[in-house]
Amino acid sequence: MTYNTWLVLHILGVVIFLGNITVTAVWKVLADRTRNPAVVGYAQRLVTVTDIAFTATGAALIAVSGQMMAGRFGGIGGAGWLTLGFALFIASGVIWITTLIPIQIMQARLARRFGRGGAIPDRYWRLATLWYALGAIAIALPLANIYLMVAKP
């Protein structure tokens, strides 16, 4: 494939990835604010579905296309902006894999119970607070990547 084809795939991956993590965070916060167990439970299930369908797909497109284009700039270590961008992408992935996904799994298990009726347990809200804080960081890192990939400082 040509460089431009990989670039289009890379941009598509960024749009899918960043679009999903941003929109998911917004509607999860809005659903949680209702404190309605049925709404919160439904939103929590959708977080899992959309992460599998869109976040993972976008991340895969970014990773593969980024690797394929990196050679044009001397590889991942060939340019400072590329090295930093790769590090930010990995850091965001580490946050997702080590904390956000496990939190989502725990919240989904809790949501299965209260989504059919019943009170939302305090543990769900403690996990939600942690998810919001770490999620903000996991969103900020790819946003910084956009600057690096466009400006190439």
What is each residue range found by the language model?
Residues 1-153:
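Polytopic transmembrane helical bundles with strong interfacial aromatic enrichment
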